[in-house]
From Swiss-Prot:
GO terms for molecular function: large ribosomal subunit rRNA binding; mRNA binding; mRNA regulatory element binding translation repressor activity; structural constituent of ribosome. The keyword Signal does not apply. One of the primary rRNA binding proteins, it binds close to the 5'-end of the 23S rRNA. It is important during the early stages of 50S assembly. The gene is rplT. This is Large ribosomal subunit protein bL20. Transmembrane segments: none annotated. It comes from Escherichia coli (strain K12). The keyword Cell membrane does not apply. InterPro entries: Ribosomal_bL20, RIBOSOMAL_L20_CS, Ribosomal_protein_bL20_C.
Length: 118
C-alpha cells in the first residue's frame, strides 16, 4: 500500500474555512482553530435567525397596522376581527404596506371593518 499524504486535503479544508471567515475580527479571520469555531457559531446563528426573521417581520407588520388602526379609532384586534367578518382576505404584510403608503385605502378598510363589527 502506498502512503497517503494528506497535506493537500488539509490545506484545502483550512483554506475553505478561512475563506468563510473572511471579514471576521482578529484571530477569527486568521487562525484556523478560532476561525472554525467562529464559522460554526455563525452557521448556528444564521439557522436560528432565518426562523426568527419570520416572527420579527410579523411583529413589525402588526405594530404598523396597530398604529395606523389606532389613528383611525380602532384597536388592532378589533380591526382584524372586523376584516375577517367582512371576509376581506388581505394578509398582514400587505395591510402594513397599505397602512404606511396609502392612508386613504387603509381608512376605507377600517370603515369596512367597523361596519362589519356593528
Amino acid at each position: 500500500m502506498a502512503r497517503v499524504k494528506r497535506g493537500v486535503i488539509a490545506r484545502a479544508r483550512h483554506k475553505k474555512i478561512l475563506k468563510q471567515a473572511k471579514g471576521y475580527y482578529g484571530a477569527r479571520s486568521r487562525v484556523y482553530r478560532v476561525a472554525f469555531q467562529a464559522v460554526i457559531k455563525a452557521g448556528q446563528y444564521a439557522y436560528r435567525d432565518r426562523r426568527q426573521r419570520k416572527r420579527q417581520f410579523r411583529q413589525l407588520w402588526i405594530a404598523r397596522i396597530n398604529a395606523a388602526a389606532r389613528q383611525n379609532g380602532i384597536s388592532y384586534s378589533k380591526f382584524i376581527n372586523g376584516l375577517k367578518k367582512a371576509s376581506v382576505e388581505i394578509d398582514r404584510k400587505i395591510l402594513a404596506d397599505i397602512a404606511v403608503f396609502d392612508k386613504v385605502a387603509f381608512t376605507a378598510l377600517v370603515e369596512k371593518a367597523k361596519a362589519a363589527l356593528a
